[in-house]
Amino acid sequence: MWQALYEELGDKGFVPISVALDESPDAARPYIEKANPQHPSLIDTEHVVAHRYGLINVPAVIWIDEAGKIVRPSTAEYGTDQFVQFHGRESGPFLDAVRAWVNTGEVRTDEAVPSHMPAPTDDEEVARAEWALAWFLHQQGKTEAAAQHFARAGELSPDDWTIRRGSMPIQGQNPMGPEFFELFKDWEARGKTTHATMAAEREN
């Protein structure tokens, strides 16, 4: 999808940068090679992008203009309607919004687009530090200690799927298996927090 948009809009200055949050380059490489993108496609094993841009789930899209300014904060968006019955967000309006932004400068929003990027809470900051420590310990082969810190990170930031679901494959769990569905049930019970609802809550 991104390659198709790049081919369509690239001559107007549009450059998508895709970033995979995966535990190793090998985990993401097959998908990147299959897509054969001509635009930058990165693999972030340290979750730097998630931490710096406040991502709590993927796929998420951030619009950044030529001056380096964020003009549309992190929003859950989808390039196809393959899983629309699961998440309920159609791809068409998003793709049209990208085209409008590139062609006219119009930044379209809707109820799913946060009004701003809220600063992380103290617990969320600690959660990210816990995740980083867990990942370091895991790479050192200290899996039991790592598991404790992964769990603590999830407790401190329970609505952050990049932490909770992102640690599943690292720990040998299936991110689409039973653990994922338990996470989904917990997320539903907690009110289905999204980037937009989080931003709205912190405005008050």
Placement of each model-derived feature along the sequence:
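Short coil turns that delineate tetratricopeptide repeat
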Residues: 124, 157-158
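Alpha-helical linker/edge segments of TPR/alpha-solenoid repeat scaffolds
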Residues: 170-198
